[in-house]
């Protein structure tokens, strides 16, 4: 239940033996299990998971995303007979589970899909918000507040930072090897549907969203928010305010990036 930060070496040893299966991370993020303090709150597991080549790591925010990921995992491991295993972080927070947009299943597996566009009449600016797992609800609240200020917002749910980064690296390697069709990073393509500076917020250390910086459009400012440091014992709201990953801080970051 304490994530890769406690048992990472055992998972690495297992990876060498080509395991298959689902490994649920039952304390997703550093602010989700509010009273456990610095010992048990997990802010780095997805960084550890990204270092293991046959580990598919996901941080879903909604039950619909989870269903898509589990379905693909079963197909990969049982039908396609791939020697991979899935690390999926879970939450224990109660909030509404929306219906997923049509046609996003493959985007969920690849790591990022367009969740919603908050359009306004005669917007005075545009901004893009990326959120994952426990913090996506804070991102959505921030988008609503920004839209109330006549700022148009595009929200993406990032289901896997590590899969996005791996895709970007594969495109870079193809370029280095002079492949005839090296491809365009998936996250670069996805963000083509949005405008303005990009703000990313997660319940993990900032190094996680920073891992995709190289594959974003170079002409757009990118700011990351995360939970660097030790965990603390407090309520979810207080923890998210302390680490600066709550809706209020996301709004402030977006307004700062627009200056």
Per-range role (PLM):
Residues 32-40, 57, 65-69, 74-259:
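Thiamine diphosphate
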Residues 13-18, 50-52, 147, 212-215:
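Alpha-helix C-terminal capping segments
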Residues 1-3, 26-28, 38-39, 58-63:
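Active-site nucleophile and cofactor-binding loops and adjacent substrate-binding regions
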Residues 40-47:
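Short, glycine/polar-rich helix-capping loops at beta-to-alpha or helix-loop-helix junctions
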Residues 1-16:
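Long, structured ligand/cofactor-binding scaffold of large enzymes
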Residues 18-21, 54-55, 196:
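Short glycine-/polar-rich loops that comprise or flank the Walker A/P-loop
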């Amino acid at each position: 239940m304490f994530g890769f930060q406690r048992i990472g070496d055992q998972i690495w040893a297992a990876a060498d033996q080509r395991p298959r299966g689902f490994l649920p991370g039952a304390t997703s993020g550093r602010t989700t299990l509010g009273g456990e303090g610095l010992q048990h709150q997990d802010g780095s597991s997805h960084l550890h998971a990204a270092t293991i080549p046959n580990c598919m790591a996901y941080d879903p925010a909604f039950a619909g995303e989870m269903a898509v990921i589990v379905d693909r995992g079963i197909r990969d491991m049982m039908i396609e007979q791939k020697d991979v295993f899935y690390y999926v972080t879970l939450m224990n927070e109660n909030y509404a589970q929306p219906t997923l947009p049509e046609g996003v299943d493959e985007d969920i597996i690849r790591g990022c899909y367009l969740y919603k566009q908050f359009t306004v009449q005669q917007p005075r600016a545009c901004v893009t918000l990326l959120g994952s797992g426990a913090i996506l609800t804070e991102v959505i609240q921030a988008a609503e507040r920004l839209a109330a200020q006549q700022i148009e917002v595009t929200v993406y749910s990032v289901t896997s930072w590590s899969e996005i980064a791996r895709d970007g690296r594969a495109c870079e390697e193809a370029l280095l090897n002079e492949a005839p069709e090296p491809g365009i990073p998936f996250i670069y393509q996805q963000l083509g549907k949005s405008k303005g500076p990009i703000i990313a917020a997660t319940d993990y250390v900032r190094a996680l969203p920073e891992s995709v910086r190289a594959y974003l459009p170079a002409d757009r400012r990118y700011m990351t928010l995360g939970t660097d440091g030790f965990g603390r014992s407090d309520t979810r709201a207080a923890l998210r305010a302390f680490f600066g990953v709550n809706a209020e801080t996301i709004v402030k970051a977006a307004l700062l990036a627009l200056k």
